[in-house]
């Protein structure tokens, strides 16, 4: 897939995931939020909790999941920490990290709290 095609495929996947969160009462507050440490695809809210969402698209859900590396997770953690610094409760703000996997047919699988050990 060319760079431009990949970019638009990623945007389409993010839009599909954002609609799922919005429709389930967890409004998306930011898209492609960028901090010094990295970028977070989507940031949603569920009550007082902040949800950081990484969207991965590939031919299958398994292939999409395999594209998430430890290094990338570390960058997402860093960016999330920067985002939380701007929240009223700072680092004490309730938060979680979801991963949304999108396959070639546009089917979405959301893994809530995916970064939990």
UniProtKB/Swiss-Prot annotation:
Official protein name in the record? UPF0102 protein Rsph17029_0461
Protein family: Belongs to the UPF0102 family.
Domain of life of the organism encoding this protein: Bacteria
Q: Which organism is it from?
A: Cereibacter sphaeroides (strain ATCC 17029 / ATH 2.4.9) (Rhodobacter sphaeroides)
Transmembrane portions of the chain: none
Q: Which InterPro entries match?
A: Restrct_endonuc-II-like, tRNA_endonuc-like_dom_sf, UPF0102_YraN-like
In its UniProt record, a GO molecular function of this protein is: nucleic acid binding
């Amino acid at each position: 897939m060319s760079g431009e095609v990949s970019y638009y495929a990623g945007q389409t996947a993010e839009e599909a995931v954002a609609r799922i969160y919005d429709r389930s009462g967890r409004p998306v507050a930011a898209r492609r939020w960028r901090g010094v440490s990295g970028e977070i695809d989507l940031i949603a809210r569920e009550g007082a909790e902040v949800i950081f969402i990484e969207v991965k698209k590939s031919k299958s859900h398994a292939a999409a999941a395999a594209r998430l590396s430890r290094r990338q997770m570390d960058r997402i953690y860093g960016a999330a920490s920067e985002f939380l610094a701007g929240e009223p409760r700072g680092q004490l703000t309730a938060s979680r990290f979801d991963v949304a996997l999108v396959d070639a047919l546009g089917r979405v699988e959301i893994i809530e709290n995916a970064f939990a050990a």
